[in-house]
Curated annotation (Swiss-Prot), chain B:
Heterodimer of HisH and HisF. GO terms for molecular function: imidazoleglycerol-phosphate synthase activity; lyase activity. This is Imidazole glycerol phosphate synthase subunit HisF. Pathway: Amino-acid biosynthesis; L-histidine biosynthesis; L-histidine from 5-phospho-alpha-D-ribose 1-diphosphate: step 5/9. It comes from the Bacteria. Its EC number is 4.3.2.10. It is an enzyme of class 4 (lyase). It catalyses: 5-[(5-phospho-1-deoxy-D-ribulos-1-ylimino)methylamino]-1-(5-phospho-beta-D-ribosyl)imidazole-4-carboxamide + L-glutamine = D-erythro-1-(imidazol-4-yl)glycerol 3-phosphate + 5-amino-1-(5-phospho-beta-D-ribosyl)imidazole-4-carboxamide + L-glutamate + H(+).
């Protein structure tokens, strides 16, 4: 049994792999090799940086078609993290508009500029730090994690899924309710960084490793 | 507002050991970075900043190794600063397990590097470190300038304007250190913290001068900081992270407890 962290040249691969190794004895590989990716029992799609670069690196490494094929086949669990969550949507408004993988209906939007809270305090973008995640629907990946637990975020764009059934978790920021945990079938994706969210983050990764959708 | 303010212990690391200078002289040894980072993680630190102050190029490899070891055991965000000058430096640190890099001198000498780095890696992992020093006299309208080389070299750049420029170029966060206060334990320079926090759209980390827990509260409530960074009050056991978090929460600040 192998968990493959898809390496397309972007993303915090070391952190994700180390955190997975911390919660499982299964083999964790960081790979861009299509045979290893096909052969893995589970996949992690990380993402860091600008989404235009993430999508173009995925294409340049001939991995976009493979990932789409795997998503269509619905055969193995896949966890998207950060920009990896965003890439599963239809398109992002970052970098002037970028088409994405289109696994879930909906788009990726910017928080906006010059935001203020009700006290007039300036709200910062990126949304950076530990925020509470409300669990909208039950999911095996929430096992053992309190509703409202804090996870670590750092992002300026957020997912807005079209269908409520695809939304498993939300947070509150800038008067918005970003869809920070989304999924369908064997796919689960989070905007926050479970690999950087201390105990609850490791628990989510452990749940992913044990998930049998 | 549910987003918590952050407490960030800072590890100043020289040739593989945590040190903390008092006004950058009189360095005391505070231990192995990996052990120190693990302790802070267990205590519930919200992030860790690793500042490489190693002077010699040969010892830089040690830093990468340290970052790898910390990232293998500590599952909270890790920022690495010190000597970040090229996109290759950034790539190396991110691959070693850093989540963000902090750019200091290179931002002053080559501001376009901040833009290049943000375009390549995303603003969210680009922190610009701003070392500011008050240049106005007592009674004058307060003014701060950017200093480099540990506060020794003036640049003539206005700190608030500089902060705005760095954000325009793509900085995702600012690490603001008062060079007047660093190492003094007299508290943050609230004036410059407030001025910059109000001037920019990105999070500001207040740094330099923390001597007690009231200083942390003031950094957030009066300074408007999104995060507070401290070293010596934690390194030498005066306060623990939970002490600090409880105290700040008691003062009405949203914290991750």
């Amino acid at each position: 049994m192998t968990i493959a962290v898809i390496d397309y040249g972007m993303g915090n691969l070391h952190s994700v792999a180390k955190a997975l190794e911390h919660v499982t004895h299964e083999n964790v590989v960081i790979t861009d090799d299509s045979r290893s990716i096909r052969g893995a029992s589970r996949l992690v799609l990380p993402g860091q940086g600008a989404i235009r670069d993430c999508m173009s690196e995925l294409q340049r490494n001939d991995l976009q078609g493979l990932v789409q094929e795997i998503l269509r086949a619905q055969g193995k669990p896949l966890l998207g993290i950060c920009v990896g969550q965003q890439m599963l949507m239809e398109e992002s408004e970052e970098n002037g508009g970028v088409p994405c993988l289109g696994y879930l209906p909906g788009r990726v939007r910017h928080f906006g500029r010059d935001l203020h809270d009700i006290d007039g305090q300036r709200l910062k973008v990126p949304h950076m730090g530990w925020n509470r995640v409300t669990q909208r629907h039950a999911h095996p990946l929430w096992a053992g994690i309190d509703d409202g637990a804090r996870f670590y975020f750092v992002h300026s764009y957020y997912v807005e899924a079209q269908e409520d059934g695809d939304v498993f978790g939300t947070t509150d920021y800038a008067g918005l309710t970003p869809h920070v945990a989304t999924g369908r079938g064997p796919v689960f994706a989070v905007q926050f960084h479970p690999e950087k969210s201390a105990h609850d983050g490791l628990r989510l990764l452990e749940n992913f490793v044990n998930w049998a959708p | 507002m549910a987003l918590a303010k952050r407490i960030i212990p800072c590890l100043d690391v020289d040739a593989g050991r945590v040190v903390k200078g008092v006004n950058f002289v009189g360095i005391r040894d505070a231990g192995d970075p990996v052990e120190v980072a693990k302790r802070y993680n267990q205590q519930g630190a919200d992030e860790i900043t690793f500042l490489d102050i190693t002077a010699s190029v040969e010892d830089r490899g040690t830093t990468v190794e340290m970052v790898e070891r910390i990232a293998g055991e500590v599952f909270i965000p890790l920022t690495v600063g010190g000597g970040i000058r090229t996109c290759d430096d950034i790539r190396t640190m991110l691959n070693a397990g850093a989540d963000k890099v902090s750019i200091n001198t290179a931002a002053v000498t080559h501001p376009e590097f901040v833009h290049e780095a943000a375009e390549r890696f995303g603003s969210q992992c680009i922190v610009v470190a701003i070392d500011a020093k008050r240049v106005s006299a007592e009674g004058e309208t307060p003014r701060w300038e950017i200093f480099t080389h540990g506060g020794r070299t003036p640049t003539g750049l206005d700190a608030v304007e500089w902060a705005r420029k760095m954000v325009d170029l793509g900085a995702g966060e600012l690490l603001l250190t008062s060079m007047d206060r660093d190492g003094t334990k007299a508290g943050f320079d609230i004036g410059v913290t407030r001025a910059i926090a109000d001037a920019v759209s990105v999070p500001v980390i207040a740094s330099g001068g923390v001597g007690d827990l009231d200083h942390l509260v003031a950094g957030v409530k009066e300074g408007g900081a999104d995060a507070v960074l401290a070293a010596s009050i934690f390194h030498f056991g005066e306060y623990t992270i939970p002490d600090a978090k409880r105290y700040m929460a008691e003062h009405g600040i949203e914290m991750r407890l």
